[in-house]
Curated annotation (Swiss-Prot):
GO biological process, one term: L-histidine biosynthetic process
CDD domains in UniProt: Histidinol_dh
Family: Belongs to the histidinol dehydrogenase family.
Cofactor(s) recorded in Swiss-Prot or TrEMBL: Zn(2+)
Residues that, per the record, bind substrate: S245, Q267, H270, H336, D369, E423, H428
Highest classification ranks of the organism: Bacteria, Bacillati, Cyanobacteriota, Cyanophyceae, Synechococcales
Annotated residues for binding of NAD(+): Y137, Q199, N222
Residues annotated as catalytic: E335, H336
Keywords: Amino-acid biosynthesis, Histidine biosynthesis, Metal-binding, NAD, Oxidoreductase, Zinc
Species annotation: Parasynechococcus marenigrum (strain WH8102)
NCBIfam families cross-referenced by the UniProt entry: hisD (TIGR00069)
Gene: hisD
Keyword Calcium found: no
Annotated protein name in UniProt: Histidinol dehydrogenase
EC identifiers of the protein: 1.1.1.23
């Protein structure tokens, strides 16, 4: 029997529903920091400078923040293929498997055009077309996120986007992580720019001498990237405003404590602002989860990050029944929802709001992060109430098609004119009458 261990801090645990709802609301507001106004001011300065000075401003900010001057801004195309060929075989195989599965799933997302004939022979429809250029932001520097490359580039390529551009910050040596370059090669990305931060978002939104102006920007980033995306929305499309990651685990007495602990830590290791929540009907699991977490935290390479996340944004809730668990989950609308219960399919049917649902003990969130197939770019901070995962449609737009004939216009003219006149739009009505006079 393993020795019982305890966390260096108490993991917040509540057993009252009203208190649980208040705690979950607190977690959804964790990005609302006092620093946000200061950061927004700095972001606005960066956006204005890049809009006015182009590459020169991008290079100045990169030199200031990242310690090198990106001249040229673009990574030479041959370096992407070189990076792919230089990968260890096991990593190359893993990326190919992920790429294949993600591609197969997203191919099924391609929307179909709609065509219908009205009562008088008029032709009506909706036509889908890809955007021309997509800009993908991939966090970088000391870390490598090839999964972010695949999860953004694959749907863009499946959509049929003509030009896919990645911006990813380089290290102080001026080099983008080779695994990111390799994934970009595999996914068919056209260009990689070795720039990051708000200046990269500005470059893609406004265009510079080196960076083409794009139609849609997708991909996660820090608060500078998120606020920059928010500021340029309307001039370009964006996927979403990503906040810190989160997981909510609903577990009953059948759940294994060590698996639950591992899944909570898998979220906590992302970021000190990441949120890990356990809602359970098992008092035994609730009482023992701290010990299971403490045991796995020993010698954890990201222990400080995990502890900060769990201390500030971790939560355990004990409920009387799974119906209450589902209701509390819906009030939180988690990015990731794991159902570690005896009948996960039945519980999933009760869930209304979640970015992604992982059913049963063999579906850890990690498989969704890397290669299950559905996209891992998901709404956070309760945005799952009104939005969903990044998809092929993120990189497409639809156009309405209307072709009336004389009979259709004859049959509907009086109603059109009546409605136009009721709104005081005389010329609208006249545009119909002139065709029939």
């Amino acid at each position: 029997m393993s020795e019982s261990r305890s966390l260096a801090f108490p993991l917040r645990c509540v057993r009252d529903r009203q208190q649980a709802e208040a705690e979950l609301q607190r977690l959804t507001r964790r990005t609302q920091t006092s620093q946000q106004k200061d950061v927004q001011g700095r972001v606005d300065v960066i956006l204005k400078a890049v809009r006015e000075r182009g590459d020169a401003a991008v290079c100045d900010f990169t030199e200031r923040f990242d310690g090198f001057r990106p001249d040229p801004v673009a990574v030479p195309k041959h370096q992407l293929e070189q990076a792919w060929k230089a990968l260890p075989e096991n990593l190359r195989d893993a990326l190919e498997l992920a790429h294949r599965r993600i591609s197969e799933f997203h191919q099924r997302q391609r929307p179909e055009d709609i065509r219908m004939e009205g009562a008088h022979g008029e032709q009506l429809g909706r036509r889908w077309r890809p955007v021309q250029r997509a800009g993908l932001y991939v966090p970088g520097g000391r870390a490598a996120y090839p999964s972010t490359v695949l999860m953004n580039a694959v749907p863009a390529r499946v959509a049929g986007v003509e030009q896919v551009v990645i911006c990813s910050p380089a290290g102080s040596n001026g080099q983008v992580n080779p695994v990111v370059l390799a994934a970009a090669h595999l996914a068919g990305v056209h260009t990689v720019m070795r720039i990051g931060g708000a200046q990269a978002i500005a470059a893609m939104a406004f265009g510079t001498e080196s960076v083409p102006k794009v139609d849609v920007i997708s991909g996660p980033g820090n608060i500078y990237v998120t606020l920059a995306k928010q500021a340029v929305y309307g001039q370009v499309g964006i996927d979403s405003l990503a906040g810190p990651s989160e997981v909510l685990v609903i577990a009953d007495q059948s759940a294994q404590p060590e698996q639950v602990a591992a899944d909570l830590l898998a979220q906590a290791e992302h970021d000190p602002l990441a949120s890990s929540v356990l809602i359970t009907t098992s008092h035994q699991l609730a009482d023992g989860i701290s010990s299971a977490i403490a045991q796995q935290l020993e010698d954890h390479p990201r222990r400080e990050i995990c502890e900060a996340s769990l201390r500030d944004w971790g939560l355990v809730v004990v409920c009387d029944d799974l119906e209450t668990c589902a209701q509390l989950s819906d009030s939180f609308a988690p990015e990731h929802l794991e159902l570690l219960v005896e009948r996960p399919e039945a519980l999933a049917d009760r869930i209304q709001h979640a970015g992604a649902i992982f059913l049963g003990p063999w579906s850890p969130e990690a498989v969704g992060d890397y290669l299950a197939g559905p996209n891992h770019t998901l709404p956070t901070c309760a945005a799952a109430r009104f939005s969903g995962a990044l998809s092929v449609e993120t990189f497409m737009r639809h156009t309405s098609m209307i072709q009336f004939n004389r009979a259709a216009l004859d049959a509907t003219a009086s109603a059109v004119c009546e409605l136009a006149e009721s709104e005081g739009l005389h010329s609208h009505a006249e545009s119909v009458r002139k065709r029939l006079s």
